[in-house]
Curated annotation (Swiss-Prot):
Subunit organization: Heterooctamer of two A chains, two B chains, two C chains and two D chains.
Cytoplasmic side: 1-31, 86-101, 162-184
PROSITE patterns reported for this sequence: COX3 (PS50253)
Membrane topology: Multi-pass membrane protein
GO MF term set: cytochrome bo3 ubiquinol oxidase activity; cytochrome-c oxidase activity; electron transfer activity; oxidoreduction-driven active transmembrane transporter activity; proton transmembrane transporter activity
Periplasmic-side positions: 51-66, 121-142, 204
Source species: Escherichia coli (strain K12)
Name assigned to this protein: Cytochrome bo(3) ubiquinol oxidase subunit 3
Knockout mutant characteristics: Increased reduction of the ubiquinone pool (in aerobically grown minimal medium with glucose).
Length: 204
């Protein structure tokens, strides 16, 4: 009886330790996101200062294609929804559904990056690269930094899917899913700001 009680207490303490470690990691990730907020705030401020510095070159109205960017936006928004479904599946302990929803999220994110690469390539080959004007430098810096963050999120997501497939929904993998969720939804919010400030206002 005493042995059973001791075993139960040890297991409870071990589980409690896992929860504490997971909570600490998520808190630490929130701090990282705050630093990312500062980075993007600086990039937005730089863009606001340089937006009229076209040096006689093209303006936002000349280069932005809103229908194209809307498709990009919907891809990223849909990826946020599918990631939410992956989180729900995690709480239901359904490993296969978690992997399936993450894979769909990855495809939406990859589509977004593919369209962004196409947009950048189209601008550069037509002589509208970041060296053309202050406006274009700020544009490429802001949108490109967001794109690099999405790309890193896709790499993280691919690695996470492999880890879940091999080890299941362990407490460590659950913490990773939650941290990536914070990161992914943060990038959605940043993109909505980019879409509004850069593309919508620039196309007016």
């Amino acid at each position: 009886m005493a042995t059973d009680t001791l075993t139960h207490a040890t297991a409870h303490a071990h589980e409690h330790g896992h929860h504490d470690a997971g909570g600490t990691k998520i808190f630490g990730f929130w701090i990282y996101l705050m630093s990312d907020c500062i980075l993007f705030s600086i990039l937005f401020a730089t863009y606001a200062v340089l937006v009229n510095g076209t040096a006689g070159g093209p303006t936002g109205k000349d280069i932005f294609e809103l229908p194209f960017v809307l498709v990009e936006t919907f891809l990223l928004l849909f990826s946020s929804i599918t990631y939410g479904m992956a989180a729900i599946a995690m709480y239901k302990n359904n490993k296969s559904q978690v992997i399936s929803w993450l894979a769909l999220t990855w495809l939406f994110g990859a589509g977004f990056i593919g369209m962004e690469i196409y947009e950048f390539h189209h601008l550069i080959v037509n002589g509208m690269g970041p060296d053309r004007s202050g406006f274009l430098s700020a544009f490429f810096a802001l949108v490109g930094t967001h794109g690099l963050h999405v790309t890193s999120g896709l790499i993280w997501m691919a690695v996470l899917m492999v880890q879940i497939a091999r080890r299941g929904l362990t407490s460590t993998n659950r913490t990773r899913i939650m941290c990536l969720s914070l990161f992914w939804h943060f990038l959605d919010v940043v993109w909505i700001c980019v879409f509004t400030v850069v593309y919508l206002m620039g196309a007016m």
